[in-house]
Curated annotation (Swiss-Prot):
GO terms for biological process: translation. Coiled coil: none annotated. The keyword Ribosomal protein applies. This is Large ribosomal subunit protein bL35. GO terms for cellular component: cytosolic large ribosomal subunit. GO terms for molecular function: structural constituent of ribosome. Gene3D superfamilies: 4.10.410.60. Pfam families: Ribosomal_L35p. It comes from Rhodopseudomonas palustris (strain BisB18). InterPro entries: Ribosomal_bL35 (IPR001706), Ribosomal_bL35-like (IPR021137), Ribosomal_bL35_CS (IPR018265), Ribosomal_bL35_sf (IPR037229). Belongs to the bacterial ribosomal protein bL35 family. The keyword Repeat does not apply.
Length: 66
């Protein structure tokens, strides 16, 4: 059976850490931030660690070679 290909959209959005956790950027920073407080905008910086089950699904179906 041939090797599964990595989904190119997932490759751009998710990274797998050395310990196997999946991280991604926070959503909600493209537009409409005039409504948000400075604190809300600040908290959307950086990356977040996905929940364990979500991370397992991402690795299984979208990043099989990670």
């Amino acid at each position: 059976m041939p090797k599964l290909k990595t989904k190119s959209g997932a490759k751009k959005r998710f990274k797998v850490t050395g310990t196997g956790k999946v991280v991604s950027a926070h959503a909600g920073k493209r537009h409409g931030m005039i409504k948000r407080t400075k604190k809300q905008i600040r908290q959307l910086r950086g990356t977040r660690i996905l929940f364990k089950t979500d991370g397992e699904n991402i690795k299984k179906y979208f990043l099989p070679n990670a």
